[in-house]
Each structure stands twice: as structure tokens, then as C-alpha cells.
């Protein structure tokens, strides 16, 4: 993990690590624990434009299918293709190698509405 990048969290249990106007997005450890073992991840297409709240990814576990929402406006620059063959990486490394997508931020001021790690920990307590 790059310590220079700032990490933000949403009330929907997503994390964003922002560096140079690009956000890497995934689900939190709390979210993956609630979902259980993931068996499929439907990844977004590169170039897709998202508005905050849009469904970006669908994750399926042995328990349920869940939408993962765009935490901010932006454009998909990369999807984590490794998850197509190994969705369990989200379970084993949710905040690292199990990231879901990267996006170019359309409006960095939207980050102000997200939580820092301390606020997120209080949210799930």
C-alpha cells in the first residue's frame, strides 16, 4: 500500500485510495466478512462513466449477490481482471490485491463527503 495515498471510506463499505486524481476502489474487510466467500465478480468496462451511487460492480458470494456502488463521479480506467479467475482474492486481501476498479475522479471535492478510517471504524462499531 502506498502510504502517500489517502484512503477514504463510504457508509456502503467501500474504500477509495486516491493518488494523482485516480481512485482505486474496493470493498472493506467488514463488507467481505458480511458477504462470505465470493464466487463471482462482475467487473466494469474500462471507459465507463459513473455517477456517484451508480452500480459499478456486482459481487456474488455463497450467501447473496450485492451491488458495489460508485462512491464518487468518474470514469473507469482499469478493472482488476485477476478477480475474474480468482474472486476469493477480495476475501483474502480486500484492501490490497482484491481491489475492484480504478477510476479517474471527475470532482475531487466529492471526497470531502466521505469518511476517514476513524469515522468508518465508528460507523461499523
Swiss-Prot record:
GO cellular component, one term: glycine cleavage complex
Record PTM N6-lipoyllysine, positions in chain: 63
Limits of the Lipoyl-binding domain: 22-104
Source organism, top-level taxon: Bacteria
Gene3D superfamilies membership: 2.40.50.100
Record key words, sorted: Lipoyl
The keyword Amino-acid biosynthesis is assigned to this record: no
Cofactor section: (R)-lipoate
InterPro entries in UniProt: 2-oxoA_DH_lipoyl-BS (IPR003016), Biotin_lipoyl (IPR000089), GCV_H (IPR002930), GCV_H/Fam206 (IPR033753), GCV_H_sub (IPR017453), Single_hybrid_motif (IPR011053)
Textual note on the cofactor: Binds 1 lipoyl cofactor covalently.
One of the protein's GO biological processes: glycine decarboxylation via glycine cleavage system
Alphabetized SUPFAM superfamilies for the sequence: Single hybrid motif
Matching NCBIfam families: gcvH, PRK01202.1
Oligomeric form and interacting partners: The glycine cleavage system is composed of four proteins: P, T, L and H.
Family: Belongs to the GcvH family.
Role played: The glycine cleavage system catalyzes the degradation of glycine. The H protein shuttles the methylamine group of glycine from the P protein to the T protein.
Name the UniProt record assigns to this protein: Glycine cleavage system H protein
Organism encoding this protein: Mesorhizobium japonicum (strain LMG 29417 / CECT 9101 / MAFF 303099)
GN (gene name): gcvH
Amino acid at each position: 500500500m502506498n502510504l502517500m495515498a489517502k484512503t477514504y471510506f463510504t457508509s456502503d463499505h467501500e474504500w477509495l485510495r486516491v493518488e494523482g486524481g485516480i481512485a482505486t476502489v474496493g470493498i472493506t474487510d467488514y463488507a467481505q466478512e458480511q458477504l462470505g466467500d465470493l464466487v463471482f465478480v462482475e467487473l466494469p468496462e474500462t471507459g465507463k462513466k459513473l455517477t456517484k451511487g451508480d452500480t459499478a460492480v456486482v459481487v456474488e458470494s455463497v450467501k447473496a449477490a450485492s451491488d458495489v456502488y460508485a462512491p464518487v463521479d468518474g470514469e473507469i480506467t482499469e478493472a482488476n481482471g485477476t478477480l475474474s479467475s480468482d474472486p476469493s482474492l477480495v476475501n483474502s486481501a480486500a484492501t490490497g490485491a482484491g481491489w475492484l476498479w480504478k477510476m479517474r475522479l471527475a470532482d475531487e471535492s466529492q471526497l470531502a463527503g466521505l469518511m476517514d478510517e476513524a469515522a468508518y471504524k465508528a460507523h461499523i462499531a
